[in-house]
Amino acid sequence: MFKKSFWFSFIPTVVWCFVILVGSFISTSGIPSIAVSDKLIHFLFYAIFAVLLYMPIRINTKRAYSFVLTCVIVFLTGFFLGSIIELVQHLVIDGRFGEYLDLLANTLGIVTALLICEILKRKSVL
């Protein structure tokens, strides 16, 4: 089915997912505030996540999935991850609040990254 190297190509994605989870669930008390908008951070973190998930699915397989299927997989995975994190923040984590605008920033980061990946693939850069 898939080669061992295919599964190893997901290691950066899993590590980045862990970074997102840790950053989303740690308490913000005692951490100095950043001058950058948190929505920009959400956008960038999920854009990076989308690229790291896109690459092994679309590029590193012999039978590359279609662009649409790859986008659906990446989008739904990222959207599900972001939704669950926002829900857990809202219901469980003290001092953290789930926000719809965070989820919107996550989604825009995913969509933007997918569009850039496909443009670069068509120009044979990726």
Please provide the spans of the model-predicted regions.
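Bulky hydrophobic segments
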Residues: 1-103, 107-126
